[in-house]
Amino acid sequence: VVTVEPGVTQGMLAVFLDEHGHDFMVPVTGAGPTCSILANALERGYGSTPHSDHFGAVTDLVAVLADGSWYRSALHEAGTAELARLFKWGIGPYVNGLFTQSGFGVVTQITIALARKPETTKICLFNLPSDDLLEPAVDKIRELLSELPGILGGINLMNRHRVLAMTAPYPAASELDSRGLMPE
């Protein structure tokens, strides 16, 4: 598990894990390396690592409530903060989910479980030369995902606009056409 605060991005966590020799995977999304780990988890984001449900991988959180008081899980409040980091369900009612997609508090910290890096990772890229091939490709992808659970970690379909959004800032207004779109 790793504990992060607002502003820690996928890229920052990847650098930290690499620099410290930790063989764990970053819970990545299709949003790219500048995406916030905490924000994505609170929005119930998902990704292509074994812990694909990012909020599902959150084991503990800390938040500031509207009256200025702090929310911590029951295990945390009982003086067992380390246990709270490791045991998601704690004791008593589970209320951490109230802080997802809501305004019940400002989450200042989450602890999230990371999956170990596999012995090997392979990436397969393919191109569909025609839009007509998308539907049969999606059907085949569904088939592969159901036949290879645990082996095939995830599929991420992207077009050039998606790749551009992940790797470059949004273009200035002067670079867009009259409809506000990027020219081909």
Question: Could you tell me what each predicted segment is?
Answer:
Residues 162-181:
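Short glycine/threonine-rich loop-to-helix capping motif typified by GTGT followed
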Residues 58, 182-184:
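Phosphate/diphosphate-binding loops
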Residues 1:
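Glycine-rich N-terminal segment of FAD-binding domains in flavoprotein oxidoreductases
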Residues 24-28, 135-138, 144-165:
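Flexible, glycine/charged-enriched surface loops at secondary-structure junctions
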Residues 6, 11-141:
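FAD-binding subdomain of flavoenzyme oxidoreductases
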